[in-house]
Swiss-Prot record:
Location in the cell: Cytoplasm
Keyword Hydrolase: yes
Known function: Protease subunit of a proteasome-like degradation complex believed to be a general protein degrading machinery.
Broad class of the protein's primary localization: cytoplasm
UniProt cross-references to InterPro entries, sorted A to Z: ATP-dep_Prtase_HsIV_su, Ntn_hydrolases_N, Proteasome_sua/b, Proteasome_suB-type
Gene source species: Vibrio vulnificus (strain YJ016)
Gene3D superfamilies membership: Glutamine Phosphoribosylpyrophosphate, subunit 1, domain 1
Name the record gives this protein: ATP-dependent protease subunit HslV
Transmembrane region(s): none
């Protein structure tokens, strides 16, 4: 599988992921890009799960973003509705972590949309390790979002055999006047 982590702190939100693609117990590729910018570079998205499935979801999610003028939550809910009702989509095995200036969300394979606590998302095979590491770093350091995501991925990569140290990191600056809706 893989590890994707998203951290929101101060005026930044980051989504980062490793590059390993595995088929069973074999590493097939080490430099896959599982984190992307969508909707005119205003939305970050990362996936864990089947690669082909994730690309299908990226395309569907981006079309929902276009349809809803970039409104992240509306697009995520509409994708989740499709995911639940479309027979082909229901068979897709992937998780999406998405974020923009205002919110961070997980879109699950069951068609659920979850807004996490503590401005932190960690999904995939190394997600629990990355979440534990990022939580400790958020609570006990002044590191910025990018540094926390990077360190959390490194720790997950040291522990999880399906996570490597070839990272893709995307970052958005959050304008100071925007409220942090995830703490509302």
């Amino acid at each position: 599988m893989t590890t994707i982590v998203s951290v929101r702190r101060n005026n930044k939100v980051v989504i980062a992921g490793d590059g390993q693609v595995s088929l069973g117990n074999t590493v097939m590729k080490g430099n896959a890009r599982k984190v992307r910018r969508l909707y005119n570079n205003k939305v970050l998205a990362g996936f864990a799960g089947g690669t082909a499935d994730a690309f299908t979801l990226f395309e569907r999610f981006e079309s929902k973003l276009q349809m809803h003028q970039g409104h992240l939550t509306k697009a995520a809910v509409e994708l989740a509705k499709d995911w639940r009702s479309d027979r082909a989509l229901r068979k897709l095995e992937a998780l999406l972590a998405v974020a923009d200036e205002t919110a961070s969300l997980i879109i699950t394979g069951n068609g659920d949309v979850v807004q996490p606590e503590n401005d932190l998302i960690a999904i995939g095979s190394g997600g629990a390790y990355a979440q534990a590491a990022a939580t400790a770093l958020l609570e006990n350091t002044e590191l910025d979002a990018r540094e926390i995501a990077e360190k959390a991925l490194n720790i997950a990569g040291d522990i999880c055999v399906f996570t490597n140290h070839n990272h893709t990191i995307e970052e958005l600056e959050i304008p100071a006047e925007l409220p942090n809706l995830s703490q509302a």
